[in-house]
Amino acid sequence: MEIALACDLIIASENARFALPEPRVGLAALAGGMQRLPRQIGMKNAMGMMLTGRHVGASEAKELGIVNEVVPQPELMDAARRWAKEIEACSPMSIRATKQVAYQSLGEANLEKSMQGQYSAVSDLLKSEDFVEGPVAFA
């Protein structure tokens, strides 16, 4: 699950299960799971999973916000490709800027400060053809 938590999106089959089971065997989720899970699903939900090593099924993982979509196993690759096509249809520079701001602003607790932050991908976007052409496409 630690690798999955590092992903931007998760599309899961109905039979997928998620857990950080390390405490059950005297270990700890040292590959980022203990830091990422609380940020993604809130402290109480994360502690409930992390302190018990409890497994959650795909439907509960969707409710908690761990996964974006749950599909039947035979449809998994089609769903992943659909998400990829939707992202691919967007401006690469906009995607880069969105990801940079979203992830870097996690480190700033103050929303106003994070909104005033300087982000290189945003600066690059504002100077790009995408920024000029984008509004024209909406007109």
Predicted regions mapped to residue ranges:
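Acidic, divalent-metal-coordinating active-site segment for phosphoryl/phosphodiester hydrolysis
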Residues: 54-60
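Interdomain hinge/lid region at the active-site interface
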Residues: 130-131, 137
